[in-house]
Amino acid sequence: AAVENYVEKYPDKIHLIDGKSTGGAKYNFFYLFGQVEAPYYMTCDQDDVWLDKKIELTCDKMLTIENKADVPCLVYTELRVVDSELNTIADTMSEYQSLDCHKRTINQFILQNSVTGCTMMVNMALRDKMLHITDIDNTIMHDWWAALVAAQFGKTAFIDEPTILYRQHGDNSLGALGINKLSYIVRRVWQKKQIQESMRLGRLQAREFAKTYNLPTDSLAVRYAALEGKSRRVRQRFYKENDMYKTGTMRRLGQAVWG
């Protein structure tokens, strides 16, 4: 009812897309991207709080990197992690998750995503390129796919300033994790199956990416996907040769032991 009220109040600004559920966050966002024609797109989760300058800062940065309309461009920002009452848990998501958002090469994005979808802006060229995807099932999340496309074919930029209050709670699909907390460390380091499954899904996504965009056999995505079934020694040599390491001590350790 709240949404309908806003539509009635601002009919020229708000359009309700009354579609049925598509099966989860990534499916919903891919569906929505396909329903709207606009020069720029920003995605939002229902319980996030946007700070006053979020749109202005993001749009200004977009305009500085978008020198051609046909170049896929992505801008994303820092977040402040808060609880359900908006009390600060961590000043920045980068600190909380041990992320390095300044490492934005295709090598890094194939291995690890640092883009949080509710902070990103994509231009039409990126939206169009993203929608070439052939099988959404083989992606991990829509924001990761956007990062891959922008890094491979266009430009990315990061704003090192929080533009959003990101609520951390049990309902987040892929929410923030306090990766440096002792409880996380003890629980995670020895979770061999979970770490290996995470790496497997990343290789599956890389294969889908290479197939969707018909990348050459010597491309990084193709070669990374081909690690599936290879020995640990082969995988570790590949990471070293291509400078592909996850950020954060614990992720790096998990990659070294089980990746």
Model region roles, listed by residue range:
Residues 131, 135-139, 156, 165-259:
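C-terminal subregions of glycosyltransferases and related glycan-biosynthesis enzymes
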Residues 1-178:
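Nucleotide-sugar donor-binding/catalytic module of glycosyltransferases
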